[in-house]
Amino acid sequence: MATFPVVDMDLINGEERAATLEKINDACENWGFFELVNHGISTELLDTVEKMNKDHYKKTMEQRFKEMVAAKGLEAVQSEIHYLDWESTFFLRHLPSSNISEIPDLEEDYRKTMKEFAVELEKLAEKLLDLLCENLGLEKGYLKKAFYGSKGPNFGTKVSNYPPCPKPDLIKGLRAHTDAGGIILLFQDDKVSGLQLLKDGEWMDVPPVHHSIVINLGDQIEVITNGKYKSIMHRVIAQSDGTRMSIASFYNPGDDAFISPAPALLEEKSEVSPTYPKFLFDDYMKLYSGLKFQAKEPRFEAMKARETTPVETARGLRAVRWNTTKRNQN
């Protein structure tokens, strides 16, 4: 079995820069995921983030999750559950404006630490985007500029905990999906596993490595690179023992950012059309919200339909929605 790619960022500025860039390129083309070590975020900050998040879950979120489980009767389920995920979660928005001060039940030290963490992650995300540009032969800053829109990128953090599950064979921690946005930076528990990606038709564990940051690519990177780089289906498997921490930060295009394949990556012949659609990111997100746990290809096709005529677009979206409703009823 292939070995999950691990990239040492210490090597990016030395004699092994070319080899490190090639490793990132291969991971983006063939995995859609890779793991970063020596990424520049201090271990002290990572340890503080982990402790504060685990303490917050125990103090505030754990009992609420147990009450939800009891209310829905999930401990006694006898057949597979397809409509929900075994996770306790909340979302912190950083850009274009922060909502951290508005989230209830967060201690002031927690808010301060997560703001500091977000600053470091934003810098790392933009550094990685420029490395992707270098590999793709795009001008430095191209991806950041493509994401910018009128108010800058959307950047936020999904804080999740996956408690022990009494029926891990029947309930997913998080159902299989690709991420809608740009580049995702995950700080995950190094003691409790559960994240898997779909590689060559088989589910493969993403190894939890202490103090690492897991990177994965979203649908917008696939579109901008015209399919050279891929977003990959992934899921979280519920575990019967231990609570898994997951802190995933999403560096996404701005709502009004216009997303399309980079002209430099299209074939030179003018008669060859792009494989991927052109759209406003917010329009894609509206479609994604109802189709997250389905294959990405129908989403791309629905967005491409909007490039033709309004009538064809309406028909295409109605067909997608009808099929979705039908599947949900089965």
UniProtKB/Swiss-Prot annotation:
Protein name: 1-aminocyclopropane-1-carboxylate oxidase 2
Any one GO molecular function term: metal ion binding
Pathway membership: Alkene biosynthesis; ethylene biosynthesis via S-adenosyl-L-methionine; ethylene from S-adenosyl-L-methionine: step 2/2
Enzyme class name: oxidoreductase
Induction field: By ethylene and wounding.
Chain's gene name: ACO2
InterPro entries the record matches: DIOX_N (IPR026992), IPNS-like_FE2OG_OXY (IPR044861), IPNS-like_sf (IPR027443), Oxoglu/Fe-dep_dioxygenase_dom (IPR005123), Plant_2OG-oxidoreductases (IPR050295)
Keywords carried by this UniProt record: Ethylene biosynthesis, Fruit ripening, Iron, Metal-binding, Oxidoreductase, Vitamin C
Chain sites annotated for binding Fe cation: H177, D179, H234
Domain (Fe2OG dioxygenase): residue spans on this chain: 153-253
GO biological process assignments: ethylene biosynthetic process; fruit ripening
Native source species: Malus domestica
Catalyzed reaction equations: 1-aminocyclopropane-1-carboxylate + L-ascorbate + O2 = ethene + L-dehydroascorbate + hydrogen cyanide + CO2 + 2 H2O
Gene3D superfamilies on file: B-lactam Antibiotic, Isopenicillin N Synthase, Chain
EC number: 1.14.17.4
Pfam families in UniProt: 2OG-FeII_Oxy, DIOX_N
